[in-house]
C-alpha cells in the first residue's frame, strides 16, 4: 500500500535508483523549490556570535574568557543577535545571575539602555530592567538597580503634551504598548519592594490607576485588569506576613505624608486605622478581607467587651436586649461621665452599634405610634397643628441630621456620598424636613375646614402626607444596612445592592424599547380618536372597547408597561371594525405582538440572566464581599465623633465643653510668649512621635518584605507541578555543573567544537 502511494521510494532501502538525483532532473510540477525569504543579514563576527551564544547557554567560564581576552577591543560588547537582543537581555531572559554580574563587572552599563532594534524583539522598547521586572526576579533587579537605572514616567491616557502628541501621531499602537510595558514593570512586586518605602500604599495607588486605565484603554482592558488584580494580591500577601498584633497595629495605623493627621489622636496614641480606611477608599477587598486584618478588626470592635464572643447564645441575646432597653440610661451615664470605666465600655464600637440601633428602633416605634394616634376629628382641617409626637420626631430628625453633618465634616463630601447608607439617610432626612416644614406652612396659612375631595391637588398638607409616607418607606429600608453584620443575611443584602445596579443598566435598554413602541402606537391610534362625549362611536376607537388607551403618549406607556406583568388587557385585533380600519388594526396587532416578543420574552429573560449572574458573582466571593462590607460598617463606629445616638447627641456634653475650653485657652495662650514656647515644644513632641512611628513602620515593613520573599521561595520549591521557574532553575544548575566539569577536564563539548579547538 505504501509502495502504491510513494512509487519512487524504496521502503526496503535496497535500491534508491528511482529517487531523483536533483530537482532539475524532475518535472517542475513534481518539485517545489524552497527559499528563505526571511533571511536577515548578520553583521556579527565569529567571536561576537560565540559571546552571545555563551551568554545564551549560560557558559560562565567562556564568557569570562572572552571578556578577558578582549583587551584590544576587537569584540563589540554591544552586539545584538538576529532578534535584537544584547548580552544583558539574553542573560536576564535566562535569569542567569552569575553571568549578569560578570557583565556588569566588566563595564557593560551601556547595555542597560534600550534595545537598538526593537523591530525584531517580541516586546517593544524593552530595557533590561523592564524585562527583569516583567519576570519579577528580585535578585536580578537588585543587581540592576545598583547601576542607577531609571524608567520613563508614564503619562496619563488623555495627556496632550508635545511628546505624547508626537508619539501618538507617529505610532499610536507602539505608544499604547509602551505604556502597557511600563505599567507591567511598575506593577512587579519585586520592583515595588525594592524601590518603594511604602509598598502597600504604592500597590493601592497602582491598582487604582490600572483600573482607571482599563476603563479608558478598552483594547488592553484584560491586561490592565490583570495587573490591578496582581497589585491587590501583593498588598494582601504582604499583610499576611504579619506575625503579631503589634505589627498589624503599626501597619494599619500608619499615615502617609499626604494624608491628614490627627495630632490629638497621635499624642493620645489612639487608633486611627488610616491605612485600613485608605484600603476601603481604594476598594481593596482582598486586603480588608485578609484573615489577619479581620482578626485585628474584631479585637478593636469588641474592645472591653471581648468576652461577649465566648458567651452562649442565650446570654448574648440577653446582653443585647438589656442594652437595647436601657439605652437612654446608658446614654445619660456617658453624657455625664464619658471618661469613667462605665463610659469607656459604652464607647466601645460594639456598644455604640447596639445603642444606636436601639435609638433607631425607638424612632421607628414613634412612626408607628404616629399613625395609631391620628386624630380623626382633624381629618378635614386644612392646617392642623403639630402634636406632641411630632415634636418627638423632630428631635430625632434633628439628631440624625446633626450626626450626618458631623460625618460630612470629618469625611468630606466625596467620601460621604460614596456610601449608599449616607445617601439614603440624606434623602430620608430631607423628606422629613420638607414634611414638617409644609405642615408648619399649612398651619400658619390655612385655618378652614373642608372635605378633602375639595382641596387643591397640591395643598401643603396633602404634599406633606405624601412625602411623609415616602420617608417612612425609606426609614424601614434603612434597616437593610444592619443586616451587614450577619454572616447569613449580609451576603443577601450585598447581592440585592448589586442587582439594583444591574437593574439600572437594564432600564437604559428597556426605556428605549418602551419609548419606541409607544411612539408608534400613539401615532397609529391618535389620529382617529373620538372624544368620550360622542357616544355613537364605532370601530377601533369605540369606548366600549379598550383601544382608546393608545390615544395619548402617557396612556400608551402605562398600557405597554403593564403588559409585562399581564395586567393590561387591550384588544388590539378586534372583530368589529369597518373595512377602512382593517389595515390599521392589523398594524397595531403586529406592533404589540412584536413588543411582546422583544420585551416579555427577550428582555425579561435577559434581566433574569443578569440578576442571576450578579448573585452568582457575589456567591462565588461571598466571604470576601461580606467581610469588606462589614468592615465598612464597623469603621463608622470606630472613631469618637458620634458616640451618643439621637436625640442625645444634640445635647452639649461635658467632653465637648472641655474640648472647646481647651481649644480656646490654647488659642489665647498661643499669642503670649509663654504660650508660643509651649506650642513649639508641643510641635516638637508631635514631630518626634511621628518620626518614631515612621521608623517603626519601616522596620516592620522590612520584616514583611523579607518574610514575603522567603515564603515565595518556599512556595516555589514546594510546588509539585513543573513550573517555568523550576525548569529555568534546573536548567541553570545543569549548565553550571556542565561548565564546571568541562573546565576541570580541560575541553569543550561538541556543541562548541565549531568555535573552540580541544586542549
Curated annotation (Swiss-Prot):
ANK repeats lie at residues 46-75, 83-112, 124-153. It holds the Pfam family Ion_trans. Residues 15-28 have a biased composition (Low complexity). It is found in: Cell membrane. Keywords: ANK repeat, Calcium, Calcium channel, Calcium transport, Cell membrane, Ion channel, Ion transport, Membrane, Phosphoprotein, Repeat, Transmembrane, Transmembrane helix, Transport. Activation of PRKCA induces phosphorylation of TRPC1 and subsequent Ca2+ entry into cells. Disulfide bonds: none annotated. GO terms for cellular component: cation channel complex; plasma membrane. Residues 1-30 are annotated as: Disordered. GO terms for molecular function: inositol 1,4,5 trisphosphate binding; store-operated calcium channel activity. It catalyses: Ca(2+)(in) = Ca(2+)(out). Residues 374-381, 483-505, 574-582 are extracellular. One of its GO terms (biological process) is regulation of cytosolic calcium ion concentration. Residues 1-352, 403-461, 527-552, 604-759 are cytoplasmic. SUPFAM superfamilies: Ankyrin repeat (SSF48403). It is a multi-pass membrane protein. The chain crosses the membrane at residues 353-373, 382-402, 462-482, 506-526, 553-573, 583-603. Homotetramer and heterotetramer with TRPC4 and/or TRPC5. Interacts with TRPC4 and TRPC5. Interacts with ITPR3. Interacts with MX1 and RNF24. Interacts with FKBP4. Interacts with TRPC4AP. Interacts with PLSCR1. Interacts with PKD2L2. Forms a heterotetramer with PKD2 with a 2:2 stoichiometry; has distinct channel properties separate from PKD2 or TRPC1 homomers alone. NCBIfam families: trp. Forms a receptor-activated non-selective calcium permeant cation channel. Probably is operated by a phosphatidylinositol second messenger system activated by receptor tyrosine kinases or G-protein coupled receptors. Also activated by intracellular calcium store depletion. Belongs to the transient receptor (TC 1.A.4) family. STrpC subfamily. TRPC1 sub-subfamily. This is Short transient receptor potential channel 1. The gene is TRPC1.
